[in-house]
Design a protein with these regions (language model features):
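Active-site phosphate/pyrophosphate-binding segments
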Residues: 78-115
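Glycine-rich phosphate-binding loops that contact phosphosugars or nucleotide phosphates
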Residues: 1-73
Length: 115
C-alpha cells in the first residue's frame, strides 16, 4: 500500500487459485488484488504437485517462480541490450563485469543511495 501511495508500480507473482483459498490479509485483500500487475503461476492450493502414497509433496512455486522471473529478466535484457550502459549487474566472474557494474552504480546512485 505504501508503494501505491508513492505512485510506484508493483508486480506480484502468485497463484490466484491458491490465494483465493488462503485467509485474507489484515488489509482484507489478496496480493493479486493490490498490485498493478500480477503474474499467475497457476500453482494449486498447498503448493505440491506430486502424490506419493496419498501425500502431496514437491513444492512447485519455487521452480515456476524462478523460471518466470528469470524469463522476464532475460527478455528485459534483450529489450535493453543496446543501451549505452547495460542496466544489469553482471556476474563478477564474467569479463568486463567490474567496469559495467561500476558504471551502473555511478549512474543510479542518485536514485538509489544503497548502491
Amino acid at each position: 500500500m505504501i508503494a501505491k501511495e508513492k505512485k510506484i508500480k508493483t508486480i506480484s507473482l502468485t497463484s490466484v487459485k491458491y490465494s483465493k483459498k488462503a485467509p485474507l490479509s489484515n488489509l482484507n485483500k489478496r496480493l493479486f488484488e493490490i498490485t498493478d500487475i500480477f503474474i499467475d503461476n497457476k500453482i494449486p492450493p498447498g503448493d505440491a504437485i506430486i502424490n506419493i502414497k496419498n501425500n502431496m509433496v514437491g513444492p512447485a512455486s519455487t521452480i515456476t517462480g524462478s523460471f518466470i522471473l528469470n524469463s522476464i529478466l532475460i527478455e528485459v535484457g534483450n529489450i535493453l541490450k543496446n543501451e549505452k550502459i547495460f542496466p544489469f549487474y553482471i556476474s563478477v566472474n564474467m569479463p568486463n563485469a567490474k567496469e559495467n557494474n561500476d558504471k551502473l552504480e555511478k549512474k543510479f546512485r542518485k536514485i538509489n543511495p544503497h548502491l
